[in-house]
């Protein structure tokens, strides 16, 4: 198996090293793992693509490239340049430093990389490691993803139907904020929503007198609906959410039919 990996935390992020190990084990002795990851931090860029400027790509080592762009840019560079003569069988994005469950999904560059791969017609999985008191205190906060990542990806690939239909399918995997041995299992999950304040701004004044704002995130440990991603993560489960690049509110099509003329 040939696997392309990317992330949004950057080429030197520890989560990318975890993902490389996961991908290496998945690819097997006869497989290949290729890395095309952002040269700089790209967290929160979503599905951004840099079509208004050129993108510099530098080779950092064997099958290892850094691109001055977003995770989606990196996937495009991997598919249409770096690996153009022999495309990958699978694209993995992550392992993100922090969860991409609930509304975080909508901002995530990690998700953006997987979504772009799906739009390009490839199997794609985003992987993220929830942070919390129970895994922040251990030597490797990525322990849960490192220990269970191979099994989760193998299960997803084994159970994905040959024909997925409609808009391209991809997966969002979030590992719980617990040590690896305390993971309770794997659960299919819906995308949750954390009620209350999400992102906001915090004003500051520079010594020069100029005013600026920091973007602040909300409480990541607020519960979400039963059976949804963040709730299951906080209970100790790995969540697997199948997703599509389709933002249509299908449940509103019939109630809004009166709009038609």
Curated annotation (Swiss-Prot):
Q: How is the cofactor bound?
A: Binds 1 divalent metal cation per subunit.
Q: Which reaction does it catalyse?
A: a ribonucleoside 5'-phosphate + H2O = a ribonucleoside + phosphate
Q: Name one GO cellular component term.
A: cytoplasm
Q: Which cofactor does it need?
A: a divalent metal cation
Reported EC number(s) for this entry are 3.1.3.5
Recorded protein name is 5'-nucleotidase SurE
Is Metal-binding a UniProt keyword of this protein? Answer: yes
What is the annotated localization of this protein? Cytoplasm
What is the protein's species of origin?
Answer: Roseobacter denitrificans (strain ATCC 33942 / OCh 114) (Erythrobacter sp. (strain OCh 114))
The GO molecular function terms of this record are: 3'-nucleotidase activity; 5'-nucleotidase activity; exopolyphosphatase activity; metal ion binding; nucleotide binding
Keywords of the record, alphabetical order, are: Cytoplasm, Hydrolase, Metal-binding, Nucleotide-binding
Family as reported in the entry's similarity comment:
Belongs to the SurE nucleotidase family.
Name the source's superkingdom: Bacteria
């Amino acid at each position: 198996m040939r696997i392309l990996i990317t992330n949004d935390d950057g080429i030197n992020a520890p989560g990318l090293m975890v993902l490389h190990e996961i991908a290496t084990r998945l690819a097997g002795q006869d497989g290949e793992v290729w890395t095309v990851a952002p040269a700089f931090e790209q967290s929160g860029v979503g599905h951004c693509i840099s079509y208004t400027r050129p993108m510099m790509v530098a080779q950092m080592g064997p099958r290892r490239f850094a691109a001055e762009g977003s995770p989606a840019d990196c996937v495009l560079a991997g598919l249409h340049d770096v690996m153009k003569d022999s495309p990958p069988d699978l694209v993995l994005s992550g392992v993100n430093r922090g969860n991409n469950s609930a509304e975080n999904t909508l901002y995530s560059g990690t998700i953006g990389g997987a979504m772009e791969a799906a739009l390009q017609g490839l199997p794609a999985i985003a992987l993220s490691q929830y942070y919390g008191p129970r895994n922040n205190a251990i030597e490797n906060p990525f322990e849960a993803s490192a220990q269970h990542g191979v099994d989760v990806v193998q299960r997803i690939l084994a159970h994905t139907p040959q024909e997925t239909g409609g808009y391209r399918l991809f997966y969002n995997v979030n590992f719980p904020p617990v040590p690896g041995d305390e993971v309770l299992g794997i659960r299919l999950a819906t995308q949750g929503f954390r009620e209350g304040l999400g992102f906001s701004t915090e004003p500051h004044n520079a010594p020069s007198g100029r005013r600026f704002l920091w973007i602040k995130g909300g409480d990541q440990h607020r519960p979400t609906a039963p059976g949804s991603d963040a709730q299951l993560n906080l209970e100790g489960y790995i969540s697997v959410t199948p997703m599509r690049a389709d933002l249509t509110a299908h449940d509103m099509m019939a109630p809004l039919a009166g709009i038609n003329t």
